[in-house]
């Protein structure tokens, strides 16, 4: 029961609001459009007022306003042409046959735009086709603006070629949006769309700018020269990879630009051209210039090459024993473009290159070439071998002489030398012993423990001086009496030195007595 009464109450309130207040709703129109306001389906003549009767838009006695933009249709509906923003407001209508107490109210809203939508990205540089670009690592400011009434809702969206749209900051009810990006990366390249939406009309307008994010090449510019087309032409190759977009490359010869040729080897980051060998000279210089849009306009990168003949080095002579292997080497330096190395046998066939096979092995490491001759033969292999280096400028050659010898009996030679050495030692030893046999006696190892007795015999005075050394296991021997007669002048003419071995039984006292007696005799002789 209460629910039923409550519903009846709401219906009554709505009826009173419609009849008493007379609110007819909201009308919306765009600038410069024509809109018709209906006065609650009234068919008789009505008057129109704006903003709480403060201004008469269309009186009962008139069909049109003074400016002609307001008119009455069907006696009750108000027609507004060339709608303007200032026309927005609250309108009321009333029957001319009644007083103003019974009025119907209408709210008119006017929208404009959006228009003049602009997406701005700065600082950037512009290509001839109008596309803007920047470099990796730059700081950019993004702006989005629009004219609209009421103020629009603004948004910036990034659309990459290989990803879903990425929204950026947005703002509602404002005519300008701005944000900054610091240290821009390569993945921020794409189309930036500034979207402006009129919140009243829902009308949407976009402005799109394509932004390219360039990056310089990651490597330095490099130049090459080669003989890939043969020795009649020289290829010049200039490469500067890793950048976006592709660099601009140009070859120069002695300050003059070389016309670019179309080659299959030409790529976006490599420029290849060729020159005839007849136009080349030793130590001629070439330069490749590279320019990239990510760098400053005057910041160009260059590389130079100087062409030259090869320089050869090798051992002039080599030796090989019959049946063994030998390796000849040849080094090349200074050749630009690089030289091709071949080996020739200038005795058997000087015009034919040596080919690898059962007899020869050829290998090359960088600028070194090796020729290995297997199973050397004096008849076949001895002689000159030629190392030839050739590039587009010319040919250089160097000769190596190979001598093939028979192997020697090394063991027999060593044995002969050893026997000769032993013979010389034996001869020297025999000669020494023959000239002075006492050397052997003194050096006799069996007498190392003996003590010798030295006896001095005075032939003139028949006096003996004996010096004894203590010893063990020595046999005693008497003085030999055969003494020559004294000299006529009374002087001592000769001494004899004799060694004796005292017997083991001789005591030390005997040696002391002999020493004392000898001393006394010497004193008497001095007196």
Curated annotation (Swiss-Prot):
The chain crosses the membrane at residues 410-430. Residues 514-527 have a biased composition (Acidic residues). This is V-set and immunoglobulin domain-containing protein 10. Residues 1-13 form the signal peptide. Residues 23-409 are extracellular. Disulfide bonds join 144-194, 238-288, 330-387. Residues 14-111, 123-212, 216-306, 310-399 form the Ig-like C2-type domain. GO terms for biological process: cell-cell adhesion; synapse assembly. It is found in: Membrane.
